Structures are given as C-alpha cells and as structure tokens.
Amino acid sequence: MKEAATFPEKRLDAYPEKNFAENEEGYRKKKWNRRKITIVLLIVATGFLTAVCIGGFFCKEAAQVTDFSRKNLPPCLSYPFGTDWLGRDMFARTVRGLSISIIIGVCAATFSAVMAFILGVVSATMGKTADAVVTWFIDLVMGIPHMLLLILICVACGRGLKGVILGVALTHWTSLARLIRGEVLQLKEQIYIKTVKKLGKSNLYIAMKHMVPHLLPQFIVGLVLLFPHAILHESSITFLGFGLSNEQPAIGIILSEAMKYLVTGKWWLALFPGIMLILTVVCFFTMGENLRMLLDPASVHE
C-alpha cells in the first residue's frame, strides 16, 4: 500500500522577502501615523502659545480690574471661569497668568538648553581636564535637592521675573548636558571623525563642522521637553511664595490665593487655572515624546 504524499507545511519564514515587505509597510504606516500626530500637536501647540500670549497682552488690564458687585460669581456665560473675592474676572486672570508662565518657560528652557549644549560639547571635545571639571560640576548640581537649589537661586537673585528665569534655567540643564556629552563621545569614535582629526583639524573645527549637525535633533527634543518642566517648576516656586510677587497674576499666585477659599465652596478659583496649567504641560510633554520617537535613532523601532 502506497503512502499518501505529504507536502511540507507552509511556514511564514519560507518567504523572507514577503515578511520583510509586510513589516516594512507596517512600520511605515506606524511612522507616518506618528509623524501626523506630531505635526498636529506642533500646530496645536504653536497656535495655543500664540493665542495665550496675544490674549495675555490684551488681558493685562482686565486681569486687575476689581468690582465688588460681581465678586464670587460661579462660572456663567458672562464669566466662563467665574470671579474671585475681589470681583476680578478669572478667565482674564488665567489667560494673563498662563502667558506669564509661558514666557518664563520659553526663556528658561532656551537658556538651559543652550547652556547644556555648550557644556556637553566642551566636556567631550576639549580634553580630559575640561571633561573632569564639567562632569564634576554636573554631579555637584545634581547632588543638591532640586527645589532647594531653585529656592536658593530665586532668593539670591531677588523675587521677580529675573530671579525665576535664572533659577529655573540653572537647575534644568544637567540631564541634557549629560546626553549631549554621551552623543559627542560616541561620535568621536566614528571613522570619519578620526580621519578628520588625523588631517590636523582642530577640536573646535570638528565640533562645529561635523558634530553640531548630528546633535541638533537631541537639542530640539531636549528643548521641547524642558519647556513643560520649566513651566511646572515656575508655578511651583511661585505657589510656595519664592517666585513672582503678588502683583503679577501668575498661575502659581492664582492657585496659592485660591487655596484659602476652597473650603468655602469656591472651587472654580483653583479648578480652571489648574486645568489650563495641566493641559499646557501635557500637550508639550506629549509633543516632545513624539519628536523624540521620530528623531532619535535609538528608538526608531519602538
């Protein structure tokens, strides 16, 4: 009796070209979706920043106008965020306070990112002595409790816009500086960098010509991710009373003043400013993470 003919079982790995094409197509779709999400977030964030800054400029006077005939009004059509104990429009105060926080966040994040970029490049390219000094300084700053160092800098510089910007900027650069330093050390091991160095080019030339262009994606992602942290820490330090003065309606000031009225049922005084602050932080943090996934080669397959 003849045995029935058997055929080899089909396996997915029998057609590697087909599997590779399917995986590549799926990756492209996933990457395109992430790119679209990032572009949409970038447009929304840019429009939000512009609208808040313009609105804060026009709400400068309205945020300080008092009217006791309308004090402690809950949210309504005339006053979407309600009014406070002095009859001030909470919508105008929230927009004005958020614009102040955004301006501080942009200035502090930019200053901190530039400082981290310069120190990271200097540490990795200017010899062992410079590397040891910068690394020691990074470890020193990271060894001090974050909020304590921020409070000390703000108090030393005086309460106000200048002190808060310097305090936030000087306490947020260390992680990005370490990242930049690590990227530069990896680039130094590349063959083309060693070839250029053997041709007699200086460290400054190599850094500016061949390293800086490769570091721009990390710098952009670091800058975007520093922005929500700067806003959050500015609001925290102002909430604790070490930041801006009470004459400036920053989000931290608004939340600090609203705490004593929560027990009386005036929930809107803290709810809407807090929601606006959280939405701003989450929006830019999400955008930064999507940018990192698009621009960072190490996370290309995540």
Please report, for each region that a protein language model flagged, where it lies by residue.
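Generic hydrophobic transmembrane alpha-helix motif, especially the helices
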Residues: 80, 84, 90, 124-125, ...
